[in-house]
């Protein structure tokens, strides 16, 4: 009986692990990221980029998957007003990587997603000979569990982003009223 219980537990863990994907992996299905998303956390090695008046404090509303690109519908807050912005991110020659021009040249990947709950993105911005990185945690719902947030914080640390540069936006004005 114990052996059967251990086998079931092991298979459950394998199935949960198999559900996660990375845009650079073979099992990534870009079609499954199509739809509505909410910005939960932003992190950057240049914190000012994601602070209240930072150019990269963007709130994702939707990803629309096309054949070789993604249309990203985002909102930004300027002078307490929500503005909508759409960007087209094109596939690059690297597997699972997309590029978009916004305040410089950006490339990004999706290191982790389970499609149904969360998506973790890693972006590198190049502008005027300088670079910085940004990571975002996005959810299908307006907030995510503390476990997923902690996994995201660990991924940020793996990319050299300090915990003090991680901003939880689940209680910030994310232009949710503009989504209707």
Curated annotation (Swiss-Prot):
GO terms for molecular function: pheromone binding; small molecule binding. The gene is Mup17. Major urinary proteins (Mups) bind pheromones, thus stabilize them and allow slow release into the air from urine marks. May protect pheromones from oxidation. May also act as pheromones themselves. In this context, they play a role in the regulation of social behaviors, such as aggression, mating, pup-suckling, territory establishment and dominance. Belongs to the calycin superfamily. Lipocalin family. Residues 1-18 form the signal peptide. This is Major urinary protein 17. InterPro entries: Calycin, Lipocalin, Lipocalin_CS, Lipocln_cytosolic_FA-bd_dom, Maj_urinary. Because of their involvement in the coordination of social behavior, Mup proteins are thought to exhibit variable expression depending upon gender, age and status of the studied individuals. Expression may also be strain-specific: in strains C57BL/6J and 129S7, transcriptional support is lacking for Mup17. It comes from Mus musculus (Mouse). It is found in: Secreted. Disulfide bonds join 82-175. One of its GO terms (cellular component) is extracellular region. Keywords: Disulfide bond, Pheromone-binding, Secreted, Signal, Transport. The lineage of its organism: Eukaryota, Metazoa, Chordata, Craniata, Vertebrata.
């Amino acid at each position: 009986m114990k052996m059967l219980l251990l086998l079931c537990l092991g298979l459950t863990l394998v199935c949960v692990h198999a559900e996660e994907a990375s845009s650079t992996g073979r099992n990534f299905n870009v079609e499954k990221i199509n739809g509505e998303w909410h910005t939960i956390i932003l992190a950057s090695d240049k914190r000012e980029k994601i602070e209240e008046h930072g150019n990269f404090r963007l709130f994702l509303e939707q990803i629309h998957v096309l054949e070789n690109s993604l249309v990203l519908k985002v909102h930004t807050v300027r002078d307490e007003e929500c503005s909508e912005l759409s960007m087209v991110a094109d596939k690059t020659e690297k597997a699972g990587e997309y590029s978009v021009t916004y305040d410089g040249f950006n490339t990004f990947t999706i290191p982790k997603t389970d499609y149904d709950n969360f998506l973790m993105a890693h972006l590198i911005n190049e502008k005027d000979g300088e670079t910085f990185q940004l990571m975002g945690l996005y959810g299908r719902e307006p907030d995510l569990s503390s476990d997923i947030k902690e996994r995201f914080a660990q991924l940020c640390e793996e990319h050299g982003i300090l915990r003090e540069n991680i901003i939880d936006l689940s209680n910030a004005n994310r232009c949710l009223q503009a989504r209707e």
